[in-house]
Amino acid sequence: MTIFDSDEEELVTTLSDFEPPVQIDTSFNKFIVVDNIPVAPEAKHEKLKSILVKIYQNRPGAEVVGIHLALDAQRNTKGFAFIEYSKKESAIDAATSLNNYPLDKSHTLKVNLLDDFSKFANFEETYKPPTREDFKPKPNYNQWLSDPKALKGYDQFVTRYGDYTDICWNEMHVGKPMVEKSSVSLTSSYVQWSNTGSYLVTFHPDGIALYGGKDWIQVNLFEHRGVQLVDFSPEDKYLITFAPIASDNPNSPKSIVVWDVRSGKKLRSFLAPPKEQFTWPAFQWSAKDKYIARIEQLEKGINIYETPSMNLLDDKIFEVKGIKDFSWSPTDLSLAYFVPANDPLPAKICLVEMPSKKLLAEKSIWGATDARFHWQNEGAYLCVKTDKVATGKTKKEKIPTTSFELFRTHEPNVPIESFEIQYAIKAFSWEPRGKRICIIHGEFKMNMFVSFFEVQKTSVKLISKLENRKLNTIFWSPRGTLVLLANLGDTGELEFYNTQDCESYGTQEHLQCTGVDWNPSGRYVTTFVSHWKVQTDTGFNIWSFNGDLVYSVLKDRFFQFNWRPRPKFMLTNKEINQIKQNIKKYQEKFDKQDEDDNKAIQHIEQTRLDNLMKEFLSFLQKGEQEYQALEPTRKQLGSYEDIDPNDIYESIETIEELIDIKTIVLKKIN
């Protein structure tokens, strides 16, 4: 039979063996349907499309391939449109993240997947109740606060040395860290606590991981390749990650990503500014995790984004021409911004309420070129350090001066006061929950001044001044009143100072100290030497608040020490004062607990030593029995000379030692 004898059906079957049939994708999983768009004539179609592209392409990795407007006979839009993405994941993300988008006051855009219409059209008429899944409670990430050790006032801290990461309890009476969990290669670089202490962040080549709970389980994983920096929102609801990317795609940026902590969902991504303009944190968080903001790169104003939608506040930039810096209040929804002097206009500092953008206060300053914002942690005061040049008789006699503007933000009409410091400022810090300010200033680092000011009813008063100090950094106790003044990176001088009584508790030294960290209670403070900066004598010292060394730990290749933060202090100043007044009632209880704890630890240690002694004596007895059992063998061999039991004797030597001499005068007898 020749090939021409084969019929057509046989020929088709033969070809299919060599080439698979074409697979046609009949799904619409890359399409979404946007409803409630404005009804527009044909002349406005392109403008409407550009608006829709701007909205629905502003998601991480989203790329709009096409937009199809539904039209009527007069070529007017029908109020809905079809949008096609390059991949189905973008369509799913848009349906969940961009639903109910407020286009304007009259139009709220609704989004559905096009594939969902077939599901809704074939919906079963017979109701089937959903299956109930068993409730699985999530771990309590603040469980450690109810731990008996935490209730006794002990705090946790994390250390990194070599390849080890240790989480320890600070039980001071033990005299050493009590390790709760030790891990090897837990992170590739460093670790970081969240602001409330609920999570511990570890860094990896492909992203970061969050750990927490009683058993330190992995809470969530955030994929962001090359991530180097993390910034949590004040209440730990969101976090921002940064990874340096040389050529980031503006349509799908990957440098800066905002995440929802609990769900692990990526909310939005941003381009990073040029390297020479980059600062961290890249965004500033408002109080209550409500907004994030950063200055627009052309200095036209501030981009303020609402959470969790990550849309611009009022869909536009907050315009402030020439803005150089801004800062949120730590407790209120208000921000302060600075615009430098621009001849002939003076510089100005403004305090603005959000989201109304109402101006609360404004101060004009002639000749100011730079400003730094310093908020008191309760938001009651804002101190702005301004740098300006005061011109002398000639241009060569320009003398740099530093002035401060104090805003009383919680008082009616926000009163503003000014005060000046004679020399250049090295460090500035507010007392937590207090009214005192500490400033290090001077011309020479070997001869610095430390000035303490107090905000009073109508003025800012100098209350104390230290002279001829070799100090460069200020570390306030979290409870205020006490402050540690340090000279980091050099001699490691430490001065413990009480601002209430204006007295120094004393000075100490931790050579080549690279960092200081107070524990949340304010009872202890840690100084450490990190291997990242110094290669010898690395480790940490823990001091009491008045400068007594509690214990010292040296570790080879020691990198990091961080106390675990506690959640925000919930007690008011009135409640704190009541506790202070009744402290004697609690003192006996606490002393009894400490005594019982010490006895328990001593008992455990003594039991351990007794067990070791019993084990040693048992080993000796076993060896003696084996030795006696081999006596016939030794006699037969004649190689060893046994000890005659009669040669063993016990000698007791009595030693008299003079312990004490007392002179007693007896009554004279006549």
UniProtKB/Swiss-Prot annotation:
Any Pfam family: RRM_1
Annotated compartments: Cytoplasm
Phylogenetic classification of the source organism: Eukaryota, Amoebozoa, Evosea, Eumycetozoa, Dictyostelia
Described function: RNA-binding component of the eukaryotic translation initiation factor 3 (eIF-3) complex, which is involved in protein synthesis of a specialized repertoire of mRNAs and, together with other initiation factors, stimulates binding of mRNA and methionyl-tRNAi to the 40S ribosome. The eIF-3 complex specifically targets and initiates translation of a subset of mRNAs involved in cell proliferation.
Annotated S-S bridges: none
Official protein name in the record: Eukaryotic translation initiation factor 3 subunit B
SUPFAM superfamilies hit by this protein: RNA-binding domain, RBD (SSF54928), Tricorn protease domain 2 (SSF69322)
InterPro entries recorded: EIF3B, eIF3B_RRM, Nucleotide-bd_a/b_plait_sf, RBD_domain_sf, RRM_dom, TIF_beta_prop-like, WD40/YVTN_repeat-like_dom_sf
Gene Ontology biological-process entries: formation of cytoplasmic translation initiation complex; regulation of translational initiation; translational initiation
Self-association state and partner proteins as the record states: Component of the eukaryotic translation initiation factor 3 (eIF-3) complex.
GO MF, any single term: translation initiation factor binding
HAMAP family the UniProt entry points to: eIF3b (MF_03001)
UniProt feature coiled coil, ranges: 568-600
UniProt domain RRM: residue ranges: 30-116
WD repeat extents: 183-221, 222-269, 466-507, 509-553
Similarity annotation: Belongs to the eIF-3 subunit B family.
Gene Ontology CC terms, in alphabetical order: eukaryotic 43S preinitiation complex; eukaryotic 48S preinitiation complex; eukaryotic translation initiation factor 3 complex
Main location per the UniProt record: cytoplasm
Top-level taxon in the UniProt lineage: Eukaryota
Keywords on record: Coiled coil, Cytoplasm, Initiation factor, Protein biosynthesis, Repeat, RNA-binding, WD repeat
